[in-house]
Amino acid sequence: MSEFVTVARPYAKAAFDFAVENQALDRWQSMLAFSAEVARNEQIAELLSGAIAPIELAKTFIAVCGDQLDEAGQNLIRVMAENGRLLVLPEVLEQFIQLRAALESTVDVDVISASTLNEQQLSKIAAAMEKRLSRKVKLNCKIDKSVMAGVVIRAGDMVIDGSIRSRLERLADVLQS
């Protein structure tokens, strides 16, 4: 997977720079999302890993995408097909999203709790994370009954585990030592 990250980086950066220059971040993210979904399709993935000429592969891929791609998006597909890189489109999308988040100074924060949190709780979490990270945050809330109570907050590689489950596990470790 790390190979895909390395391969996808220049394509994501080129698409991002072009999108910023043309004030088309939403459009490009949409095109990349659609293209990534097409590339994830089993039949298309099989086609991409086959021995089809790059020009034919690009034509087929663009035809499948239809009017979801503008001329610049089609050019990206042609270049990636020529270099045999269409399989990394999902990673190109991920890196594009990360570049956009960095530009907009936002970060995705996963909030995992045992039950649904109310608006007041969510706004307190958002405010605390914005202060801690010095960025705007976008909360992604998930319910996981195994948390029992409390919350687990993930932002990038930072994890704040305030769940009862983790406290019980730590207590069990202390009692066993």
From Swiss-Prot:
The keyword Membrane applies. One of its GO terms (cellular component) is proton-transporting ATP synthase complex. It comes from the Bacteria. It is a peripheral membrane protein. It holds the Pfam family OSCP. GO terms for molecular function: proton-transporting ATP synthase activity, rotational mechanism. The keyword Protein transport does not apply. Keywords: ATP synthesis, Cell inner membrane, Cell membrane, CF(1), Hydrogen ion transport, Ion transport, Membrane, Transport. SUPFAM superfamilies: N-terminal domain of the delta subunit of the F1F0-ATP synthase. Transmembrane segments: none annotated. InterPro entries: ATP_synth_OSCP/delta_N_sf, ATPase_OSCP/d_CS, ATPase_OSCP/dsu. It is found in: Cell inner membrane. F-type ATPases have 2 components, F(1) - the catalytic core - and F(0) - the membrane proton channel. F(1) has five subunits: alpha(3), beta(3), gamma(1), delta(1), epsilon(1). F(0) has three main subunits: a(1), b(2) and c(10-14). The alpha and beta chains form an alternating ring which encloses part of the gamma chain. F(1) is attached to F(0) by a central stalk formed by the gamma and epsilon chains, while a peripheral stalk is formed by the delta and b chains. Belongs to the ATPase delta chain family. F(1)F(0) ATP synthase produces ATP from ADP in the presence of a proton or sodium gradient. F-type ATPases consist of two structural domains, F(1) containing the extramembraneous catalytic core and F(0) containing the membrane proton channel, linked together by a central stalk and a peripheral stalk. During catalysis, ATP synthesis in the catalytic domain of F(1) is coupled via a rotary mechanism of the central stalk subunits to proton translocation. This protein is part of the stalk that links CF(0) to CF(1). It either transmits conformational changes from CF(0) to CF(1) or is implicated in proton conduction. This is ATP synthase subunit delta.
